[in-house]
From Swiss-Prot:
It is found in: Cell inner membrane. NCBIfam families: ATP_synt_epsi, PRK13443.1. Pfam families: ATP-synt_DE_N. Produces ATP from ADP in the presence of a proton gradient across the membrane. F-type ATPases have 2 components, CF(1) - the catalytic core - and CF(0) - the membrane proton channel. CF(1) has five subunits: alpha(3), beta(3), gamma(1), delta(1), epsilon(1). CF(0) has three main subunits: a, b and c. Its main location: membrane. This is ATP synthase epsilon chain.
Length: 148
């Protein structure tokens, strides 16, 4: 079995990273998971959270994602994120924009007469996951600059 696997993280705005890694820790919609070389093939839905990339030398790099999905196989992980930023770029301003978008999704879901409870619940869960992400990385999910 190889010591590393290929990891690619892509968002609509840009290709964030393409590197060989020892492991990738992902915020799966059904729970966190770690992909390593030799992993069984899987497609995983992601919730907002941190993706941690562990290089061959053990150094770690984190990326904040707002959701998406990952394709995992025995020699690579390809993550397609709705939005993604290196943790170092996650300023309060960037996080405020992400939270405002999540709040708009909740309001839009509530306003649709035909929206089922599942759609509203999914939007509310997205907002809660975004708040948890911000708290985890030291950003204020209740910052006063949010448009309500």
């Amino acid at each position: 079995m190889a010591d590393t696997m290929q990891f690619d993280l892509v968002s609509p705005e840009r290709n964030l990273v393409s590197v060989p890694v020892r492991e990738v820790r992902l915020p799966g919609a059904d729970g966190d998971l770690t992909a390593m070389p030799g992993h069984a093939p899987a497609i995983v839905n992601l919730r907002p959270g941190l993706v941690t990339v562990v290089a061959g030398d053990g150094s770690e790099t984190e990326f904040a994602v707002t959701g998406g999905f990952a394709e995992i196989n025995n020699e690579s992980v390809t993550l397609l994120a709705e939005r993604g930023h290196p943790r170092a770029e996650m300023t309060q301003e960037v996080f405020n924009e992400m939270m405002a978008q999540a709040r708009r999704r909740v309001e839009a879901a509530k306003e649709r007469e035909s929206a089922g409870e599942e759609l509203v619940a999914a939007a509310v869960k997205l907002l809660a996951d975004m708040e948890a992400l911000g708290t985890h990385i030291g950003l204020d999910p209740n910052h006063a600059n949010f448009p309500h």
